[in-house]
Amino acid sequence: MSAANADFELFRVFLEKTCGIVLGSNKQYLVSSRLNKLMEQQGIKSLGELVQRIQTQRGGLREMVVDAMTTNETLWFRDTYPFEVLKQRVLPELIKANGGQRLRIWSAACSSGQEPYSLSMAIDEFEKTNLGQLKAGVQIVATDLSGSMLTAAKAGEYDTLAMGRGLSPERLQRYFDAKGPGRWAVKPAIRSRVEFRALNLLDSYASLGKFDMVFCRNVLIYFSAEVKRDILLRIHGTLKPGGYLFLGASEALNNLPDHYQMVQCSPGIIYRAK
């Protein structure tokens, strides 16, 4: 094995232990593209040196590396159907079952905030057409591993490029305030439903409490089968009986029939906690 390949193996082990992400052996180009600038700034010549520096030094290097490797582009109202299923099927059902209690939604691995803010907009749209049905309100808890992503998400400000990814002109006008050339901010009424917290999905979820819905979309694809199963079992522990799990369009929940019931929607699939 060449020195470069050995260094890459060291880094793969570090990343999986730190945040569960499994890198294929063909992902050296991805690691280079994400870390070259940081390594140059830090005067680090190889991935092996980077891992050694992380292990022997205190400071923010570990967080900067994890930030660089876990930051992903995201969309407003990604795949559309989960938000329609939420409004047309899940909210009416849970309101009926919950007897007027506040509903809680967890947006796991929320990145720069588009998913939780999309959820808050969908809640607002539901309220406008179902007056008085959500008297106790809805709390959205949004978590991410990346400190820089959480800072950006809390700020709730986006540029033209981000705004063009899945947001209709009507929603832009209704739910955002212009903040100068090419920048918009999520309106306070939409932001007020969302609470952002730092969380590594490998860590305990006990502090989060119980939820009526969990959105863990386009996240599990990065984990090994073993870690994925562990996360899904622990998510089940955060769901109230009859609560719903939303996964990504290309993700499936296999081999957990004692915990989740598949619910066919049109289109899409969601999962009800047993």
UniProtKB/Swiss-Prot annotation:
Chain positions recorded as S-adenosyl-L-methionine binding sites: N72, T74, R78, E115, D144, N200, L201, R217, N218
Q: In which domain of life is the source organism classified?
A: Bacteria
EC number(s) stated in the UniProt entry for this protein = 2.1.1.80
Q: Which UniProt keywords apply?
A: Methyltransferase, S-adenosyl-L-methionine, Transferase
EC top class named in words: transferase
| Molecular function terms, GO-annotated | protein methyltransferase activity; protein-glutamate O-methyltransferase activity
Q: Which InterPro entries does the entry link to?
A: Bact_Chemotaxis_MeTrfase, Chemotaxis_MeTrfase_CheR, CheR_C, CheR_MeTrfase, CheR_N, CheR_N_sf, SAM-dependent_MTases_sf
SUPFAM superfamilies associated with the record:
Chemotaxis receptor methyltransferase CheR, N-terminal domain, S-adenosyl-L-methionine-dependent methyltransferases
| One Pfam short name | CheR_N
Task of the protein: Methylation of the membrane-bound methyl-accepting chemotaxis proteins (MCP) to form gamma-glutamyl methyl ester residues in MCP.
Q: What is this protein called?
A: Chemotaxis protein methyltransferase 1
Naturally occurring in which organism (per UniProt): Pseudomonas aeruginosa (strain ATCC 15692 / DSM 22644 / CIP 104116 / JCM 14847 / LMG 12228 / 1C / PRS 101 / PAO1)
